[in-house]
Amino acid sequence: ITTNNFMAVDQAKRDIIALYEEDFGKIDDSGRAKALYDAIPAQLSRNAMRYQVGKAIEEERVSRIMNVVKEMEDSMTVNVVYHSDDPNTGLALTKNEDYFKMYTSDTGLFVTLAFKDNKITENIIYDKLLNDKLSTNLGYVYENVIAQVLRATGKNLFYHTIPYAEGKKYYEIDFVIPDRHKISP
């Protein structure tokens, strides 16, 4: 930070991600946890209704990896947001574990994951990101920030989808949180 060199910061974040991935091997030695984590930016940028496990791990299904997702959530490296089929004050009553979204618990690491295909993320990328000049939709970065902040305040996170009149597309409420005797979108 004192050098204003984001590349040095990026390398430190890559080292942290490597440690996470090493720990994911302890959770699941098949590599599924690592694959799920690495796919978070791609999953969110698709703007899909849920985390599509089969796109992150070929021929895998939610039912077979749910224990891995729970372990990742318990490790506090990810924030998992579950679909609430009927959002009332008892959101957990209609929690649908087959439909979830996954966010990183650290948005800085999320940004590095998004550019992980390069050996290092150049200062110019961080400069453009900080000055809102990056030519990409950053909505998913902001979504990750909100998930991180809400979880840091102790909120349990849910989301809800509502079909359009035609039923083929959905409106989505990204975060539905219980707030005493009511819910807040």
Locations of the language-model features?
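Short catalytic-loop micro-motif centered on adjacent basic/acidic residues
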Residues: 185
